[in-house]
Structure formats: C-alpha cells, structure tokens
Amino acid sequence: MSRIRFYFDHSLAGYFLRRAREKWFTRPPQRVNHHGVTLQVDCLPQEMQGILLAGRYECAEVALIPGFITAEDKVLEIGGAIGFLGLYCRKIAGVKEFVSVEPNPKTIAYLRSNYELNGIKPVLIEAALAAADGPVQLQISNLFWTDSLVSKADQSTGQPITVAGLSFASLVERAGLQFNTLIIDIEGGEKYIAFSDLPEAVTKMLIEIHPEIIGMEAYKVLETLIRSGFSVQGHSWNTWSLQREKAFRPRGQG
C-alpha cells in the first residue's frame, strides 16, 4: 500500500491533487506578525495575503525607518493603507504622535482593525490629498496599494469612488499637529503637494515616488525637495528618506 501511495504522490495526478488541496483546503493564518506588527490577513485578497506572508510588504520603508524616524518625531502619514507603517512607527520606533490620512473606506476598516489588534488607537483623517478641497474621484481596486487620484493607462480592474479631498494646507490644519516628519505614499498623488511651501518645522520626509504613473514629474518632486533644503539620507527602490535643517530658507529670502 505504501508503495502504491509513493508512486501516486509522485505522479502527475498526485501533483494536481496536491495543488487542489493547497488552493481549496489550505487556509492562510488569520494573522501574521510582520516586523513586530500584528496584521489581519485572512480578510485580504489572495495576492495581498501572499505578499504579507512572504514578508515582502513595505520592505523599502522598513529598511529606511530605523535610525531615521525616532521616538521624538511627530509624524503625518499621507496614505495610511492598512496601518502597518503607522503601527511600525508607534511600536518599533516609539513614535507617540502619529496622524494617518487615508481615503478608501474599505482600507480604513482594515487599518482600524489592525490598530485594535495591536492595542493602539489610530488618529485618522478620512480624506484624500488633492489639489483643492472638495469631492474627488479615487480609483480603487482589490489591491489597496494601487488606489490613486491619478488616471492610469490600465484601469481595467479598478473602479472610481467619490471621497473627500483636502489640499495639503487643509490636511496640515486638520491634523492639528506640529509635525516634523512626513511619510508619503499616494500612488502619484505626490504631484499635488506644493513641497516648496512645506512648513519650516518639517525636517524629515519618507516618500515613495511613482514615475510609472506620473512620469518625470516624480523626479521633479525630488528636485523640488532638494531645492527646499532637503538632502537624501537613503533610498530603497523608489522610496527616499530626506532631511533638512530646521527653519531652512532658500537663497535670497530672509
């Protein structure tokens, strides 16, 4: 009997049976510990589950945050997603004041659930960063990290929803926090930020740029930041950490 089982397991039929079992009967864990943060995964689409279970989610940011963002920093995060970076900063980096901005109602539900799992209450602004205040169309899909205000070449799997839009100045006012650090990942929406008008108190930035969505405008964002006194501290893929001296003023001013 064992010999028959051996030959069956190593046959083509045995291979397809194993694949069927893996697909239909093997359930992913309900939760995963990702770099010290507990995240709910069984509610997410299969592709997103796979990325989290493989430990590949937000790898660039995790590589750049240690030693860059500290417990003394006050952080405004634009693009809160499912709450991982906020929780990582709170739990691992020790940040005490952290405000997240996220427009997608479904993703907000994931964020709130993950914060609850980790015993932390989120401070959340439910809106999208936009060029001006008012309702905006957000393109969403099952993969929350593709949500964007910017039209893309391939929107075949997405759908538009109407969400509240706030200008950067309005977000700053709504946050009610004298933050010194910005975390930005908004799928091309970085082009809507007037980086040359950043509050002087902002001395640190962790930003993912998206040239695949907004083309050369993404690199103009970096150029504007450097002209505003920021210098590159590190980068991983399209994510950059930048820092400047406090109360920087461009040449010819002040």
Predicted stretch roles:
Residues 64, 88, 192-201, 220-224:
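A short acidic, amphipathic alpha-helical/loop segment
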Residues 1-104, 109-113, 211, 218-219, ...:
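S-adenosyl-L-methionine
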Residues 29, 35-62, 125, 130-170, ...:
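Glycine-rich adenosyl-binding loop in Rossmann-like folds that engage adenosine-containing cofactors
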Residues 89, 111, 138, 193-194:
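Hydrophobic packing residues within well-ordered alpha-helices of enzyme cores
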Residues 111-122:
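Short, conserved SAM-binding/catalytic segment
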